[in-house]
Amino acid sequence: MAVALAGARSPGAGAILSLRRLAPAAAAPVRLGGSGTPGTRRRRGIAMAAAASAPPAPADALPKGADSFFRTVISNMEKVYLSRNPTAKTILELVRSYDGDHICYDHFAFRTFGVDGYGIKSLAEFFTDFGYVPREELRFPAKKLRALWFSPPTNDGYTGTGVYGPLPRIFISELLVDELSPQSQDIIQKYIRTSGKGNKHATLASTSGELTWEKPIYSDFQVLSRESEYAAWTLVNGYALNHTTISTHRLISDIRSINKFNKFVEDNGFKLNSEGGILKVSPDGLLQQSSTVADSALFTFADGITESIPRSYIEFAERLVLPQFKDLPNDEVNEHHRRDGFEVGNADKIFESTSNDQLTRRSA
């Protein structure tokens, strides 16, 4: 994943974070808007696994026309992402060359400002309109973030790959703007005010790669960078895809093992996010993730200053078979037999893929 950018440096293991499991929408509605306390939910303790209890049933498969339209939209999001991030584009090409055309996406991830309707809700409503189901909230107190992930509608039977294969999970995070310093809050609010009703067209912004607010000045970017690298990233990238994630276990060659996949990536000259170790593993051992360091690109700010900014990265995830299905023959194992959801501890470290520490290490 997850994931992505980063605010304050990751806290130690003892300081980490909390995750609350949300009840299925029919039983307890999920609040998608802005920052603050989410809707009704059951407390599940720290960093609990997503697969700990029965998930809500997925929505029915989309009608043919809706499915085609939805895939065209996410394909356009992907095109913007690949045009700006040569690392992701090259790795996808290398995997296809080595493994054949078997790439499936585990999830897509986005970053938002959790204020005045520009947070999770601004993107979520598009996905829920097309059958996605809100699942769990994750909290990252040190980074002043919350996130919500969404499971796709039923999409069995798709034999395509990439955006034309099984639909990805969606992971949307938001910065809790009202927890920042007054100076940073003022900067973010200043740009939000120039957006008009841009939050209502977040999906369009993601497919076009355009900001819905005025292009920022460099000094504002610098101020946000000092307090929250996530805030600075979002200011200059807006609703663009933060990362896509290859589902390694859906590949067919030896690199379906994430450890071999990581070696494959490094052997081809790419640096992986080293925060907390190259491989991020959930406490149950069933969700294993890694990611590249974000690409950088020159950006000309509104005041004419041109500087390098972080763009996006690509993640890799292997979801292992749940214990109750461990005796299933390999050819009978489907995605619902594997570990689902996300893990706060993993995602917290994946967020660091756009941090200055990782970017500096990449260029070293």
Swiss-Prot record:
The keyword Transit peptide applies. Its EC number is 1.13.11.93. Pathway: Amino-acid degradation. It catalyses: 2-oxoadipate + O2 = (R)-2-hydroxyglutarate + CO2. GO terms for molecular function: dioxygenase activity; metal ion binding. Residues 1-49 form a transit peptide. Its main location: plastid. Catalyzes the decarboxylation and hydroxylation of 2-oxoadipate (2OA) to form D-2-hydroxyglutarate (D-2-HGA). Is involved in a D-lysine catabolic pathway. Involved in the regulation of starch synthesis and amyloplast development within the peripheral endosperm during the grain-filling stage. This is 2-oxoadipate dioxygenase/decarboxylase, chloroplastic/amyloplastic. The lineage of its organism: Eukaryota, Viridiplantae, Streptophyta, Embryophyta, Tracheophyta. The gene is FLO7.
